[in-house]
């Protein structure tokens, strides 16, 4: 309903944020909508990496290209002193990307400013476009856009199948 009964107008991209893993949402979407690619988002801890690996496997099985991996909450930045601490582990996403032959798109910190800015209605790239956090998001977005632009275009799923019959 969200995809078929909403007038999206002219979009350059439609990004769908899905829950982790390989549930019905991911499978149904990949079977009913032509998907350009998947960006895998994980946190560095082992249990999250297992879920992310399952997601990668599912997307590969249904023929959805993996555009790369983002490591979310890669490091906690203290709002008082700026100290950086890897409270969920370090480098799990980078290792997973390397072992799985995926591009590592970048790491996002666990930073209270991200939540505060989003809750105020002005995400980091709007609230502080020159800030370090915004620059991380923008670099990831530019990399994904470039990867999409480099893909060969397959519009076959957008057109109905036409059958010509000799019976007239």
Specify the residue positions occupied by each region the protein language model found:
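Flexible phosphate-sensing "switch/lid" loops adjacent to ATP/NTP-binding sites
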Residues: 1-15, 20-22, 28, 32, ...
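Conserved catalytic-core segment of NTP-binding enzymes
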Residues: 5-8, 12-13, 19-120
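Short, intrinsically disordered/low-complexity patches at protein termini
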Residues: 48, 64, 129-130, 149-150, ...
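Generic structural motif recognizing short loop/turn segments at the entrances and edges of beta-strands
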Residues: 84, 122, 158-160
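C-terminal boundary of histidine-terminating zinc-finger modules
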Residues: 120-135
